[in-house]
């Protein structure tokens, strides 16, 4: 499933969320590899549908509080529509 972030950090800020409950990336098991691969394919499709696939976009998993995770059900952020810098803030 995918939907718009409630507090967008970019013109395009979508969340890709699996149905299976996995609290953090640290809880992934080898059998979840296909699920993560599917999430990346969904992000690629959404980037194209959002017309950000050519200029560039960022995908992010935040893991635990120190990295900014506030919802303990893994989800991938898809951000685009503006320039990003490195390192992130």
What does each model-identified segment do?
Residues 1-89:
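HIT superfamily nucleotide-processing domains
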